UniProtKB/Swiss-Prot annotation:
Comp. bias (Basic and acidic residues): 1645-1663
This protein's encoding gene: CTTNBP2
Gene Ontology terms for molecular function: protein phosphatase 2A binding
ANK repeat positions: 709-739, 743-772, 776-805, 809-838, 842-871, 912-942
Stretches with biased composition (Low complexity): 386-396, 1624-1638
Region feature (Disordered): 1-23, 203-222, 358-440, 454-479, 499-616, 1446-1477, 1580-1602, 1618-1663
Keyword Cytoplasm belongs to the record: yes
Gene3D superfamilies: Ankyrin repeat-containing domain
Protein name (Swiss-Prot/TrEMBL): Cortactin-binding protein 2
CC annotations in GO: actin cytoskeleton; cell cortex; dendritic spine; FAR/SIN/STRIPAK complex
Quaternary assembly: Interacts with CTTN/cortactin SH3 domain. Interacts with STRN, STRN4/zinedin and MOB4/phocein; this interactions mediate the association with the STRIPAK core complex and may regulate dendritic spine distribution of the STRIPAK complex in hippocampal neurons. Activation of glutamate receptors weakens the interaction with STRN and STRN4.
Organism expressing this protein natively: Colobus guereza
């Protein structure tokens, strides 16, 4: 049993293990649990549970049998029947070794293994089950989500269908609209075609009209010619008539003698007989009839010779005249003036000639008791063409005078006879205009009077010129073109006539007649004296309103309706003449040329006077010749148009027409008693004021119907500005000076309304009520302020008028002044302390009124004008100082003064809810809106009653302004980081430059801000690198991102907004506007990439050297390791080298190498041993035994020109080229030890030479280095100064580039041209040592408005730098030959007299032609600074008189500018092509001849030398003692520089073209010498001047001598062999610009052959 049990145990224990293992292996191999479905998983789970149950049963069974098995194993081993068990026992019991494994498997261990495996399987199955459950849950959730997504998909699909339907409808609508719009477009196109057709028609019509106009002009010219011809005929006829008149006078004298004889005979006959007297009377009557006939003939003749009349000295008996036509002058409100004290005709008239022809036979017509009427002038002056009357009847009238011809009584200053027609509104007063008539006249009024009344040569209103006799009238055509001018001058003349007319008439001689002058403008009155005529009155039309003249303090009132004049002749019975007043009235619209002369024969003749509809006033005029006062012409009415808020002025509705009857008293009898009226108390006042005593009754009660009382007369006098009448009325007792008419207008109101300051002063001194208001509540101050009479306003304010008085509508004087744009009145009222916030009934304030008119000045005054302290008011300039510029271009007044008006007043709304900003924005008054926006309290979002903001009602311009209202202006600056110390030549380079100001609005996004910054930088780079003066606006259209200097937005290293770093494209949470406000960023700084980043952008911007060239230099250093920079002194070599070293150092450090810069300054004492120590100590020279280090060394050798290159670098040339241990070089140290060294591969050697070219032995060093030549006439030096100074100007103007015509631009251009012209002249003089780089000119001061600062700086630069260098170079050249080896020329310590003269001449020529030429300062101002320049006062005649008579035969007299560098690659100085082997001698001749024909630099001395060789030249010992050929060449070149261009017309030396000069030194061997001149400088087109006579002679002589033949060309300096080839063709391009020639040269100058031997002769070109 035991054996069976023991033997069966393994089988029972293996069974479940094998089953479980097989199941697991099958599960692993056949399927994956993750891929089972739910049902399969359930089945698998049931299988697992069954296995677990079976396992539990096995375990229980084994436990039950365990005891048996234990006993069996323990005690059954001694069974001898089983040897296997015995062997097992022995094995286990033997040796006690625990590590021995049993021979057979223990069932218990098998069971334990099975149990462990089952546990593992259980754990794995439970884990898989949990994973399956979680996946099941996820699956369920995904199914739910899928269902939700499907439902949402269905909804979206439905919505999509709906949207598609809607879109279809929209598309259909759009298609319809497109069709409609296309139809409209077609219609508009058709309309446009029609309009264009109409436009073409209009153009054709316009052209036709122009042609007609030209034809009319030609016609008028022809008519004028005809008139001139007729006038000449008239002159001839006048002379004939004068001769006839002389004959008649002689005949009359004979007749008088005959009469005397007859009288004597009669007396004798009386004695002899009593029956003969009856026969003498008919004879006498017959004689008188003869005289009458002769005078009648004169009347007819007078009409035909109207235009030519001389000054007449009347005889004493010329008082008798025929009836004549007497014009009634339309002088409104002008006082009448009687005859002059010297007689009825002023014989001292210097301004105007009397219109009276010489007549001698009219003294017997009228008796001497009749008032003397001067004869009508022999003028036929007709303002509007010929009159319509026929030949006058000598018995009835003389030829009727036109409206403005000379009056019959007295000659007026404004009435020049013949053609100087008087202004129609002028009064009739004395022509003399002497001081006796105007004792108290204002000189300004007198001057104005003479201006408008015509002096001896001033044109009158018809365009004629008042000249000394004989003068002529112009044609009617020319008069018609001057109507407007005539009206304007009439108005001013009328205004001046009131004050220029005498107020106190001098007593005239008895018999001088009084004169009546009435009428208005433009009606023209005519008065004719007839034998049996009755006065007749016609009513005229209202006159036009003249322009308002608020500026004249004494401006009279506007013209008024005319006074009707009835001249009563009832008391002139003994004269037999009557006065008929005929007023020919024309409406204002009718032109003056429409007036015509009415013949008096057509006037009705009645026995009784025809009275006008209104009562007349009988003016009894005294015969004493006293001046008639202004009462005779005082008129009321015709007020100017009422201003807004003001009603019509006083008496405008019922303007009084005052008919006046002027009675001409007979002879000189006193006034009859019947004509006198009571009231003699007024006679003194009347007489004292210049009135005739006979006017006194008029003032009391005279006439059929008097005026409406004294107060009305007072108002009329005040309204018209009649100070005389007003003062007289104010002296009366009991007169109510505060009387008001129906409208409530007082006399003070009328005077203030019309701007009569004197009347206002009189009324105020008479204590008139200053605040009396009319029926609308307007006071005199309101009226004066509305009309702009600031003097009246000032006077009323001084008399304490109520400045805040409000009318019935609430209008204050300030409001009315603002409403009518009266700036002076506003200023006076504000200074008086008026209230600015008074509102009208409509809610309008003065601010509303000022904005409504769009007057910026008024608004500025209201907002900024303060009440001055201590009575000092702002002057007008202060109140308007600064333009309110949003761009901040000028300093605005609010930067100095703050607004004085509160925010409530600015934001006050009227009845409609509109503020002042609403009004300004709606009317498009951008300037007014801008000023309002400057006020900090403005509320632009305030809405009106229609819920509209200011932006809603604004125009487009104003909307743009409002959108920029709160825009921040942040200056944008460019910084280049730290500027190196001045040792590197960067002391004039600026660290920061302001390029523009950015507008940052509230709605500006960060993207817009980034684009603005990038665009501003791009525009700035393009502007400073352009050829001309560009503004930022000019370059915005340029789409290129890179500028000419290579900078762009990519050159930016970093940007700081205030102190916050920012990069392009970066965005913050806040908008740029909020960000700037919050961080208080005052500027935006752009830092360019510099050497620290391994870039050269900052170096480019600081030095203005193009980035491409700097990168090229850096590439040369990195590639060749040995580079030397050379150029004229001041070419920034040190700065360039140091910046390249910094950039190279940082690049090497970025690559992981350590780098060091070693700098050494070379001087004359720097030895080769010191240089060796420098190389060794800096680890640049390494011993052969030593291993190289990874450290990079950059060695800079500065100022190599101070030492000899060949001596200093000779031993280092070979190892520098071959840097390796294979080519070592042995150097001996100072201690005597020698050692082999080699140059490290990582060593960079850079040097600087301040010399334009190498010479002598230094050329041996040239091939071992890479050379960078910084030529002054090539890039980068050529444009560096221009770019630098332009950037300086832009920075000075805060980013705004000024216009090219700005004085700053001109002075900067001048400084630039000085540098270029100076170098051009120095190069031409062959003194390359004196050439200057741009460094010295970088410090040019830019001070706007002070060009003198730049000139003073230039004088210091000239005296301190330029002149000493030029002096040294000239002495070096003129004293000794150039010495090879050291490279420098030494001048004599004690120059000779001739050398000193050459130096002075050179300095003088350079100063005048290169420095002072082109200076924009005025000549007088420049002369003051010329003395500051030393060397400018040398007589250039010494130079021009010098001649090269001591030159050796066969040598050339001219010499050239030099460049001796054989490795030069750019032919800036050279010509495009060189020697051609196939050039024939004949070709050279032709070219030479053509060149000489165009030679502009030929001098007179050369011409003389060509003609006379040595015979006519000056002895050198007498003038200049010059010892060498170079010295003679120098003087020759100075001659050519100052010849052919006069000192007064200095042109640019830079334009001197390549010359080919010939000198006849030997008989048939003329020498050709070519001068290489600079072709880079700009030239002016007006520089090409014709040859003078001397030059022409020289050309012809040279031509004849050239044909003799060409032997050879000799040159002492290295010159391209084919220099001769292109001389003539270059001269043909005399008018082309230098830029064009530069391009041609640069394109063709790559291949050059240079002669390096100084004394080698060039063979003939055809050899």
């Amino acid at each position: 049993m035991a054996t069976d049990g023991a033997s069966c145990e393994p089988d029972l224990s293996r069974a479940p293990e094998d089953a479980a293992g097989a199941a697991a292996e099958a599960a692993k191999k056949e399927f994956d649990v993750d891929t089972l479905s739910k049902s399969e998983l359930r089945m698998l789970l049931s299988v697992m549970e069954g296995e677990l149950e079976a396992r539990d049963l096995v375990i229980e069974a084994l436990r039950a049998r365990r005891k048996e098995v234990f006993i069996q194993e323990r005690y059954g081993r001694f069974n001898l029947n089983d040897p296997f068990l015995a062997l097992q026992r022995d094995y286990e019991a033997g040796a006690g070794d625990k590590e021995k494994k049993p021979v057979c498997t223990n069932p218990l261990s098998i069971l334990e293994a099975v149990m462990a495996h089952c546990k593992k399987m259980q754990e794995r199955m439970s884990a898989q089950l949990a994973a399956a459950e979680s996946r099941q849950k996820k699956l369920e959730m995904e199914k739910l989500q899928l269902q939700a997504l499907e439902q949402e998909h269905k909804k979206l699909a439905a919505r999509l269908e709906e949207e598609r339907g809607k879109n279809k409808q929209v598309v259909l609508m759009l298609v319809k609209e497109c069709k409609q719009l296309s139809g409209k477009v077609i219609e508009e196109a058709q309309k446009l075609e029609d309009i264009m057709a109409k436009l073409e028609e209009e153009k054709k019509k316009t052209n036709e009209l122009e042609e007609e106009l030209s034809a009319e002009k030609r016609r008028s010219t022809e008519m004028e010619a005809q008139m001139e011809k007729q006038l000449s005929e008239f002159d001839t006829e006048r002379e004939q008539l004068r001769a006839k008149l002389n004959r008649e006078e002689a005949h009359t004298t004979d007749l008088k003698e005959e009469i005397d004889k007859m009288k004597k005979m009669i007396e004798q006959l009386k004695r002899g007989s009593d029956s003969k007297p009856s026969l003498s009377l008919p004879r006498k009557t017959k004689d008188r009839r003869l005289v009458s006939i002769s005078v009648g003939t004169e009347g007819t003749v007078t009409r035909s010779v109207a235009c030519q009349t001389d000054l007449v000295t009347e005889s004493a008996d010329h008082v008798k005249k025929l009836p004549l036509t007497m014009p009634v002058k339309p002088s409104t409100g002008s006082p009448l003036v009687s005859a002059n004290a010297k007689g009825s005709v002023c014989t001292s008239a210097t301004m105007a000639r009397p219109g009276i022809d010489r007549q001698a036979s009219h003294g017997d017509l009228i008796g001497s008791s009749v008032p003397a009427f001067p004869p009508p002038s022999a003028n036929r002056i007709e303002e509007n063409g010929p009159s319509t009357d026929s030949t006058p009847d000598p018995t009835s009238s003389t030829p009727p005078l036109p409206s403005n011809a000379a009056p019959p009584t007295t000659q007026t200053p404004g009435i020049a006879p013949q053609n100087s027609q008087a202004p129609p509104m002028h009064s009739l007063h004395s022509p003399c205009a002497n001081a006796s008539l105007h004792p108290g006249l204002n000189p300004r009024i007198q001057a104005a009077r003479f201006r408008f009344q015509g002096n001896a040569n001033d044109p009158d209103q018809n365009g004629n010129t008042t000249q000394s006799p004989p003068s002529r009238d112009m044609s009617p055509t020319s008069r018609e073109n001057l109507v407007a001018k005539q009206l304007a001058r009439n108005t001013v003349t009328q205004a001046l006539s009131r004050f220029t007319s005498p107020q106190a008439g001098a007593p005239s001689r008895p018999g001088a007649p009084p004169t009546g002058d009435v009428g208005t403008h433009p009606p023209v009155g005519r008065t004719s004296l007839k034998t049996h005529g009755v006065a007749r009155v016609d009513r005229g039309n209202p006159p036009p309103i003249p322009p308002k003249k608020p500026g004249l303090s004494q401006t009279p009132s506007p013209p008024h309706p005319q006074l009707k004049v009835i001249i009563d002749s009832s008391r002139a019975s003994n004269t037999g003449a009557k006065v008929d007043n005929k007023t020919v009235a024309s409406p204002p619209s009718s032109l003056p040329q429409g007036n015509r002369v009415i013949n008096e024969d057509n006037l009705p003749k009645s026995s009784s006077p025809q009275l006008p509809p209104k009562p007349s006033i009988d003016l009894t005029v005294a015969p004493a010749g006293c001046a008639v006062s202004a009462l005779a012409t005082s008129q009321v009415g015709a007020w100017p148009a009422a201003t807004p808020g003001l009603n019509q002025p006083a008496c405008s509705d019922s303007s009084l027409v005052i008919p006046t009857t002027i009675a001409f008293c007979s002879s000189i009898n006193p006034v009859s008693a019947s004509s006198c009226r009571p009231g003699a108390s007024d006679s003194l006042l009347v007489t004292a004021s210049g009135w005739s005593p006979s006017l006194t009754p008029l003032l009391m009660s005279g006439g059929p119907a008097p005026l409406a009382g004294r107060p009305t007369l007072l108002q009329q006098a005040a309204a018209q500005g009649n100070v005389t009448l007003l003062s007289m009325l104010l002296n009366e007792e009991g007169l109510d000076i505060n009387y008001s008419c129906e409208d409530g207008h007082s006399a003070l109101y009328s005077a203030a309304k019309n701007g009569h300051t004197d009347c206002v002063r009189l009324l105020l001194s008479a204590e008139a009520q200053i605040n009396a208001a009319d029926k609308n509540g307007f006071t005199p101050l309101c009226a004066a302020a509305a009309q702009g009479h600031f003097e009246c306003v000032e006077l009323l304010i001084a008399y304490d008028a109520n400045i805040n008085h409000a009318a019935d509508g609430g209008q204050t004087p300030l409001y009315l002044a603002c409403k009518n744009e009266n700036k002076e009145c506003i200023k006076l009222l504000l200074e008086a302390g008026t209230n600015r916030s008074v509102k009208t009934t409509d809610g309008w304030t003065p601010v509303h009124a000022a904005v409504d008119t769009g007057n910026v000045d008024s608004l500025k005054l209201l907002m900024y004008h303060r009440i001055p302290a201590c009575g000092n008011s702002f002057n007008e300039e202060e109140s308007e100082s600064g333009v309110f510029d949003l761009d901040g271009g000028e300093e605005s007044p609010e930067g100095i003064f703050k607004p004085v008006v509160p925010a409530d007043l600015i934001n006050h709304a009227n009845r409609e809810g509109w503020t002042a900003a609403h009004i300004a924005a709606s009317k498009g008054f951008k300037n007014c809106l801008e000023i309002l926006c400057r006020h900090g309290g403005l509320e632009p979002e305030r809405r009106d009653k229609c819920n509209r903001t200011v932006h809603d009602v604004a125009t487009d311009d104003c909307k743009h302004l409002l959108e920029n209202l709160n825009a921040l202006k942040i200056p944008l600056r460019i910084s280049v980081g730290e500027i190196e110390p001045s040792d590197y030549g960067s002391d004039d380079l600026e660290c920061e430059n302001t390029i523009c100001a950015l507008n940052i609005r509230k709605q500006t996004s960060w993207d817009d801000f980034s684009k603005a910054v990038s665009q501003a930088l791009t525009n700035h780079f393009q502007a400073i690198s352009s050829d001309g003066w560009w503004s930022l606006e000019d370059v915005t259209c340029n789409n290129t991102t890179d500028s000419n200097i290579g900078l762009s937005a990519r050159s930016i290293r970093s940007i700081t907004l205030g102190n916050v770093p920012w990069s392009v494209g970066q965005s913050f949470t806040q908008s740029p506007w909020d960000f700037m406000r919050k961080n208080k960023a005052e500027h935006i700084t752009v830092l360019l990439s510099g050497p620290q980043e391994g870039c050269l952008s900052s170096v480019t911007y600081a030095s203005m050297i193009p980035l491409q060239m700097m990168q090229n230099y850096l590439r040369l250093v990195e590639q060749y390791h040995n580079v030397i920079f050379h150029g004229p002194e001041g070419s920034l070599q040190d700065y360039i080298v140091h910046q390249l070293a910094l950039c190279l150092k940082h690049r090497q450090m970025a690559a992981g190498f350590s780098c060091e810069i070693v700098r050494a300054e070379i001087d004359a004492g720097f030895s080769k041993e010191q240089l060796l120590d420098l190389f060794i100590s800096s680890a640049c020279l390494i011993p052969v035994k030593q291993s190289p280090s990874k450290k990079k060394i950059i060695i800079i050798l500065e100022n190599l020109e101070k030492s000899s290159l060949s001596e200093l670098l000779r031993d280092f040339l070979a190892p520098l080229e071959n840097r390796s241990t294979e080519s070592p070089c042995t150097f001996q140290k100072g201690n005597g030890m020698s050692e082999c060294y080699y140059f490290h591969e990582n060593c960079f050697l850079m040097g600087t030479i301040a010399k334009a070219c190498l010479q002598g032995s230094d050329l041996l060093v040239q091939q071992h280095f890479r050379w960078v030549q910084l030529r002054w006439d090539g890039e980068p030096m050529q444009g560096l100064l221009q770019r630098f100074l332009r950037r300086k100007v832009v920075n000075k103007f805060k980013g705004q580039a000024p216009s090219p015509c700005d004085p700053v631009c001109k002075i900067v251009d001048w400084a630039l041209s000085v540098w270029r012209q100076l170098n051009s002249c120095l190069a031409r003089l062959g003194t390359p040592e004196a050439l200057l780089g741009p460094k010295y000119f970088l410090s040019c001061p830019v001070v706007p408005g002070h060009a003198q600062v730049t000139v003073k700086w230039m004088s210091k630069l000239w005296n301190g730098v330029i002149a000493p260098r030029v002096q040294e170079a000239i002495l070096s050249r003129a004293s000794v030959k150039r010495q090879p080896g050291f490279g420098q020329t030494t001048a004599k310590r004690h120059p000779s007299q001739g050398q000193q003269a050459v130096v002075k001449a050179a300095l003088s020529i350079l100063l005048n032609k290169a420095v002072l030429h082109g200076c924009p300062l005025p000549r007088a101002e420049l002369d003051q600074h010329t003395a500051d320049f030393k060397g400018g006062s040398f007589p250039l005649s010494i130079v021009s008189s010098y001649n090269s008579c001591n030159k050796k035969k066969g040598e050339s007299g001219a010499w050239r500018k030099v460049n001796t560098s054989p490795r030069r690659k750019s032919g800036r100085f050279s010509l495009p092509t060189w020697n051609k082997p196939d050039l024939s001698t004949e070709g050279i001749k032709n070219k030479t001849i053509s060149q000489l024909n165009y030679n502009r630099n030929a001098s007179l001395s050369k011409q003389k030398s060509l003609e006379n060789d040595l015979s006519l030249t000056l002895n050198l010992d007498q003038r200049l003692s010059l010892g060498s050929d170079d010295e003679a060449d120098l003087v020759k070149e100075l001659q050519s520089m100052c010849s052919s261009k006069s000192e007064s017309d200095i042109s640019k030396i830079a334009d001197s073209r390549d010359d080919l000069r010939m000198f006849d030194s030997s008989g048939n061997n003329p020498l050709l010498s070519a001068t290489i001149n600079n072709l880079r400088m700009p030239v002016s087109q007006k520089e090409v001047s014709p040859l003078s006579s001397h030059q022409t002679t020289e050309c012809s002589n040279s031509k004849s001598k050239t044909e003799l033949g060409v032997s050879r060309v000799k040159s002492f300096l290295p010159v391209p062999r084919s220099k001769v080839t292109l001389c003539s063709q270059n001269t043909k391009r005399s008018s082309s610009s230098s830029n064009t020639r530069q391009i041609e040269i640069n394109n063709n100058s790559k291949k050059e052959n240079w002669n390096l031997h100084k004394n080698e002769h060039l063979d003939k070109p055809n050899k």
